[in-house]
Amino acid sequence: MKLDVINLDGGKAGSVDLDDAIFGIADIRGDILQRVVTWQLAKRRSGNHKIQVRNEVSRTGKKMYKQKGTGSARHGSRRAAQFVGGAKAHGPVVRSHAFDLPKKIRAMALRHALSSKAKSGSIIVLDTAVLTDPKTAALRANFDKIGLKNALVIAGPEVDGNFKLAARNIPNIDVLPNAGLNVYDVLRRHTLVLTKDAVEAISARFAEKEAA
């Protein structure tokens, strides 16, 4: 697959070949994408919800009344879950919501996510993502020229500092380095913008995995 390379002013700056094994998958596996997005979001959950168990509730542990002779149940503590102000039975505690997912599934999902963007014509290739000044207004004007309203920009091995500063105040624009490329962020934005360096890095990344 061949795409035109453009610059930030919208002018053509050559062309680039995209690997069909990464960007040309025809049958997109939505089930694999769903599994990986769920895995990513589960890892992000803080898991800090917490209730007080019986030994943490600030209530008396003294026996409420004598064991026999009252006709009532044999309660022994106000901390029991059935009483107002008592503990919560089987409530949430601090834990990790993360779970394991095979690396091959994660790699497959990334290929399918990239292919879905290519299939819908939602990939733009930039020559570079570098600015001389961190001016948000200037970058927004450039994005308007190339029709970017909602996009993920993969800017190369490192994100240019001026580009990062200029882009962070623009709504619905995310900027990540090559290492930050992930399924969730690819899918949540309408357009995927790759620099030429990013395209080469993606191809090299999957070539290394296949060699391994």
Swiss-Prot record:
<dbReference type="GO" id="GO:0005840">
    <property type="term" value="C:ribosome"/>
</dbReference>
<comment type="function">
    <text>Forms part of the polypeptide exit tunnel.</text>
</comment>
<comment type="subunit">
    <text>Part of the 50S ribosomal subunit.</text>
</comment>
<dbReference type="InterPro" id="IPR023574">
    <property type="entry name" value="Ribosomal_uL4_dom_sf"/>
</dbReference>
<protein>
    <recommendedName>
        <fullName>Large ribosomal subunit protein uL4</fullName>
    </recommendedName>
</protein>
<dbReference type="Pfam" id="PF00573">
    <property type="entry name" value="Ribosomal_L4"/>
</dbReference>
<keyword id="KW-0689">Ribosomal protein</keyword>
<keyword id="KW-0694">RNA-binding</keyword>
<dbReference type="GO" id="GO:0006412">
    <property type="term" value="P:translation"/>
</dbReference>
<keyword id="KW-0687">Ribonucleoprotein</keyword>
<dbReference type="GO" id="GO:0019843">
    <property type="term" value="F:rRNA binding"/>
</dbReference>
<keyword id="KW-0699">rRNA-binding</keyword>
<dbReference type="GO" id="GO:1990904">
    <property type="term" value="C:ribonucleoprotein complex"/>
</dbReference>
<comment type="similarity">
    <text>Belongs to the universal ribosomal protein uL4 family.</text>
</comment>
<comment type="function">
    <text>One of the primary rRNA binding proteins, this protein initially binds near the 5'-end of the 23S rRNA. It is important during the early stages of 50S assembly. It makes multiple contacts with different domains of the 23S rRNA in the assembled 50S subunit and ribosome.</text>
</comment>
<dbReference type="InterPro" id="IPR013005">
    <property type="entry name" value="Ribosomal_uL4-like"/>
</dbReference>
<dbReference type="GO" id="GO:0003735">
    <property type="term" value="F:structural constituent of ribosome"/>
</dbReference>
<dbReference type="InterPro" id="IPR002136">
    <property type="entry name" value="Ribosomal_uL4"/>
</dbReference>
